[in-house]
Amino acid sequence: MMDLNLSPAPAADADLIKDTTEATFMADVVEASQTVPIIVDFWAPWCGPCKTLGPMLEDAVRAAKGAVKMVKINVDEAQQIAGQLQIQSIPTVYAFFKGQPVDGF
């Protein structure tokens, strides 16, 4: 039987959650946050709490179905951005909207 469910397809993970670098941070976070809030997860591979928090954030972003997106940034590979945003411990999470950080923990 043909499925006639005409609701839009859910956004793919690649549209909702992505890794970024110093080279793509402006486009992935600042520019993208003009239209939808962006959750930025600052993490490192050696960080135990990051391994717990990251998947929880990803699940929440998927559940929001496109109302918010997530960008992950490895602070070991993006030390300049981490310094500019004064990231002093990880995991650190910021919410960007309209090009600006609006909240964080």
Residue ranges and their predicted role:
Residues 75-77:
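Conserved SAM/SAH-binding loop
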Residues 1-66, 79-80, 90-92, 96-105:
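Proteins that catalyze or organize thiol-disulfide redox chemistry
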